């Protein structure tokens, strides 16, 4: 079936990769841009950019892109650090990483979690990559103040795994202009990450930003990846400690952490119950995704196991 790379729904005859309305949401035009690079060319360009130290930080390869939509051109081109979009290609180490990240971001949307704009996009050789719109720049290119929790807790990047989620919650409480709402949203995002096998949400994967230029608030979720199904050898369930541990987590551990940062138990209970009722929709989204059948089955099994573990203690 010919499906949209943005919403996963079927395309009409004559449409290619995107519905016009989906392309407009992601790229500002009903005509999706070209990605004029093959995977091998992207690897070569990425190596060049890394040598000039203009790559974006993080373990997963990331490239900064600009949309050139003038003089009849409609292409995404690789730039230095401050492009409009961030692109993540396929990797040799972990298969289907772009597809996994994109569907996990879709699940976050179904869960009511605010995320950055995102989509899959096809390269010139037909392979798929993941693309997201930056939120630390305005449409005119002006910088929006944004700090991750390495910066906010004054830790160097190499210490991004040396902290706790309780520390993040207390830092949100200290700096956010919407501290109670953002603490709740942070805890819900953390529970979602556990349910979806994301054990790589370290200090740099949460941020505060100031879209109005004055007030710092929790940034939309980004870098949501089900690491557990692509790297089952890693038995840790979270990147940082929660209630003093990273694995064998229970619902009680989340409630204990929530209590420390002032979140009522009832708020979390209500949301978990709603998510469990919505699990068939989550699985339907995975079924519609671009994952292989094997990877879809792994995702279903992990969701079932994690939901069972949390709800049995309610």
Predicted regions and their residues:
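A residue-level signal for conserved active-site and pocket-lining positions in enzyme catalytic cores
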Residues: 65, 108, 149, 200, ...
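Conserved ATP-binding subdomain of kinase catalytic cores across diverse folds
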Residues: 42-162, 218, 266
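Active-site activation/catalytic loop segments of kinase-like enzymes and analogous catalytic loops
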Residues: 65, 226, 230-248
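C-terminal regulatory or interaction extensions
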Residues: 143-144, 150, 225-233, 262-264
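ATP-dependent phospho-/nucleotidyl transfer catalytic cores
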Residues: 124, 129-195, 240-244, 256, ...
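Conserved kinase catalytic-core segment
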Residues: 93-109, 164-230
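Regulatory N- and C-terminal appendages and interdomain linkers associated
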Residues: 1-50, 216, 260, 284-314
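Mobile late-domain/C-terminal helix-loop "cap" segments
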Residues: 243-304, 310
């Amino acid at each position: 079936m010919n499906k949209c790379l943005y919403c996963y729904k079927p395309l009409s005859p004559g449409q290619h990769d995107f519905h016009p309305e989906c392309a407009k949401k992601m790229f500002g035009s009903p005509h999706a841009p070209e990605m004029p690079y093959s995977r091998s060319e992207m690897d070569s360009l990425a190596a060049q950019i890394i040598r000039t130290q203009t790559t974006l930080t993080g373990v997963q390869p990331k490239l900064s892109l600009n949309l050139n939509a003038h003089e009849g051109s409609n292409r995404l081109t690789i730039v230095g650090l401050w492009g409009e979009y961030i692109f993540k290609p396929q990797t040799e180490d972990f298969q289907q990483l772009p597809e996994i990240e994109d569907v996990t971001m879709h699940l976050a949307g179904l869960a009511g979690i605010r995320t950055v704009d995102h989509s899959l996009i096809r390269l010139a050789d037909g392979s798929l990559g993941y693309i997201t719109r930056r939120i630390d720049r305005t449409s005119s290119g002006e910088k929006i103040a944004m700090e991750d929790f390495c910066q906010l807790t004054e830790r160097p990047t190499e210490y991004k795994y040396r902290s706790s989620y309780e520390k993040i919650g207390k830092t949100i409480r200290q700096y956010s202009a919407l501290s109670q709402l953002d603490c709740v949203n942070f805890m819900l995002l953390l529970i979602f990450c556990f349910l979806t096998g994301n054990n790589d949400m370290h200090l740099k994967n949460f941020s505060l930003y100031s879209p109005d230029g004055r007030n710092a608030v929790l940034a939309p979720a980004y870098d949501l990846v089900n690491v557990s199904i692509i790297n089952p050898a890693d038995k840790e369930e979270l990147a940082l400690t929660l209630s003093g541990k990273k694995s064998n987590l229970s619902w009680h551990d989340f409630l204990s952490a929530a209590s420390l940062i002032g979140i009522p138990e009832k708020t979390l209970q209500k949301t978990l119950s709603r998510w469990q009722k919505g699990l068939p929709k989550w699985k339907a989204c995975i079924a519609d995704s671009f994952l292989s059948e094997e990877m879809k089955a792994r995702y279903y099994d992990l969701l079932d196991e994690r939901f069972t573990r949390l709800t049995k203690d309610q």
